A protein has these predicted regions:
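Short, small-residue-biased leader/transition segments that mark boundaries at the very start
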Residues: 1-3
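Conserved AdoMet/S-adenosylmethionine-binding subsite of the radical SAM
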Residues: 5-148
């Protein structure tokens, strides 16, 4: 079940889920929400924070104070739609030293930027510790197909 992180009482639900040692709890967030109340808890879920870059028109909503609080339990995913998005992702990764304290993924906006171009950028900038993530379902099936 997917629940938006900003729902009322979500913190209480996450606390209950994280107390169960048989459960692995991971929350994906769009990056605009302050995660510090959850990130500072000893028992907490893993977070995948999508960082929307300028091509999305949403970068101004990103909550940057989350970045230093993320750990190797978490992931930052930069959704890139242009060369300038790649450059910005690299800038943020270096500024916050992300690869030394959290997982970092680059993910292409399907059809907007070629994964091969992203790999070349990663090689040219020695982006070791950064993973390219492709939406495999859009490669395997028609990218407009629903329910896959």
């Amino acid at each position: 079940c997917a629940l938006p992180i900003f729902q009322a009482d979500i913190g209480e639900l996450l606390d209950l889920l994280c107390r169960d040692p048989e459960l692995y709890v991971e929350v994906e967030t769009n990056g605009s929400i302050d995660l510090s109340p959850q990130l500072k808890k000893p028992l907490r879920p893993s977070f995948t924070m999508d960082y929307k870059l300028s091509a999305s028109g949403m970068e101004h909503h990103m909550f940057l104070p989350n970045l230093p609080l993320l750990t190797m339990q978490d992931t930052v995913k930069f959704v890139c739609g242009s060369q300038s998005d790649l450059e910005r992702a690299w800038e943020i990764t270096r500024e916050y030293d992300l690869t030394h304290h959290t997982h970092v993924y680059l993910s292409p906006v399907f059809g907007a930027i070629q994964p091969a171009d992203m790999v070349e950028f990663m090689k040219d900038h020695h982006m070791t510790g950064v993973t390219l993530q492709i939406q495999l379902h859009k490669v395997i099936w028609d990218p407009n197909k629903q329910g896959v």
